[in-house]
Amino acid sequence: MLNHLQKELNELVNRGLDRTLRIAVTGLSRSGKTAFITSLMNQMLHINRVDNGHLPLFDAARQHRILAVQRVPQLDLSIPRFDYEGNLNALSQDPPMWPQSTRGVSETRLAIRYQRSDGLLRHLKEKGTLYLDIFDYPGEWLLDLPLLDLGFEEWSLELQRQLNGTHAALAQSWLTKVAKIQLTDTADEDILAQLAKDYTDYLWQCKKQGLHFIQPGRFVLPGELEGAPALQFFPLLHLSASQWQQLKREAKSESYFAVLTKRYEYYRQHIVKGFYENYFETFDRQVILADCLTPLNHSRQAFSDMQQALHQLFRNFHYGKRHLLNRLFSPKIDKLMFIATKADHITTDQLPNLIGLMRQLVQEGGRYVEFADIATDYTAIASIRATQQVVVNQNGQSFKALQGIRSSDKQKVTLYPGSVPGRLPSADFWQNQKFEFDQFEPRRLEQGENIPHLRMDAVLQFLLGDKL
């Protein structure tokens, strides 16, 4: 007990003296969180192994003020260790493979030994150590955070309002089955389980169509909860306001309506709230990743769906400046970075447009954050660079193109990926033409080589530069 209290006290002191920095790497499914964390660790661990030319925009590395970086044991021994070595092995195979997507929570901690450059503490101690804590977790689980503010009826009505376009078409079969049950009847466990499975199948179909706003997120990535009654419920999207009120008055405790309500509340209070309290209340800085290219290949609704999902997430993070007292007792996010991933899937002249799309994606959330007066930045990166930009001469003209291994057929290709719109086109655009941004395979990582990237050094400078 005393050892536990001592550990917590030491962590409070370290946080207050800026010795510990906890970074939330946030993003929806397939946005590149695992690749981002793997690359960030790799770039840091390779500092001083070469001339640091891989990080020209990271001042502390370029000025050789970082003395050493090593991975150290994390504080919470109940959380699995981030599989950095496994991810490197995947990239080192022949042929190389992308690291596996996140299927559960994991954590890593880096100790960064550095030479102080300025600030009050440089007079007290020339050298310092910054402990960097980074968490990885499934993007699907993030989608459940908005449920913290919604009861069963509110949640169902929210999804009812969004039931249009592709969502409505894919949900039709499941909706027909739900409409056939009498919600005041005594609940049959087998029927509930089957309807919950049908709802889960609908969510999977949404994912395949490039849609991101799917709830509950754990239905498509349940982890240890697979098959548990806690995941055997579903929203009621066919009820009117008067029907809701009638069911609340008349439905008995063993009815379908009551059981669905209880299971939703259990899920919200025990699973979602526990996840939020354990991982999201003590972050200092936040990175929000978004793949803005892949949704463009599908439809305007796919992009708008991703936009809505991210806006919902902003409600559940604490933003504000970090002064000494709130660093100790009320940690808040004081820096926020919006990152468009897969910047290596387009040519460099299209990067401003990609960043412009990212700005449009988070505009509403950005306005909210600006009110809290914290530092924000927008950029585009490739955590693990899969292509090389080349210049192609054709018919007497030169233009930029990409060279890499295309994922669809595993062939080495040289192609022009096309233009990125600076703003999201109208819905009419997709009726006449469409975007076709290819996916690429990673290049093989040689032993001892740092992971090739685009602008990870700019990310490190923004997140860590003022602490080193």
Regions found by a protein language model. Give the residues of each.
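Switch- and interface-adjacent substructures of P-loop NTPase systems
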Residues: 4-13, 17, 43-332, 347, ...
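Post-Walker A alpha-helix
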Residues: 36-37
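Hydrophobic anchor at the beta1->P-loop junction of P-loop NTPases
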Residues: 23-25
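P-loop (Walker A) phosphate-binding loop of NTP-binding proteins
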Residues: 28
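GTPase G-domain guanine-specificity segment
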Residues: 345-370
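Short, conserved secondary-structure transition motifs
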Residues: 339-346, 379-390
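Conserved glycine(s) of the Walker
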Residues: 31-33
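Short secondary-structure boundary/capping segments
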Residues: 40-45, 147-152, 303, 352-358, ...
